Amino acid sequence: MLSDITSEFESRKPGIASFETFAAECMSEMNGDPANASLYLMLGLTARQFYDQFNGQPVTVAVAEEGKDRMLAVARAAEAALGEPADDKLSVLNEIALKNFQTG
């Protein structure tokens, strides 16, 4: 359940391992909640992107905390969209895509 995954992520230290775990948990949850699979996928990809960007590098506490705050905001928006009409879910998916995957 997304609220559990988000709460666990929030309670962890803001290091890259927390992002890796969050991503894996979201990807795993896709199978258990197919009606919301796209939300879990985008959250997982977003967390994985942070992990991939900083894996093997020193990360300042400020950068890690900023990333964690952004991830929590997106996860909470996705939580709010669960059980809502498809248009609400699509809005959250678009928000995640625009904030995290824009190029150029």
Predicted segments with their positions:
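Solvent-exposed, amphipathic alpha-helical segments
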Residues: 1-8, 50-53, 77
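Short terminal alpha-helical segments
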Residues: 1-34, 91-103
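Amphipathic alpha-helical interaction modules
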Residues: 16-69
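Amphipathic alpha-helical binding modules
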Residues: 63-104
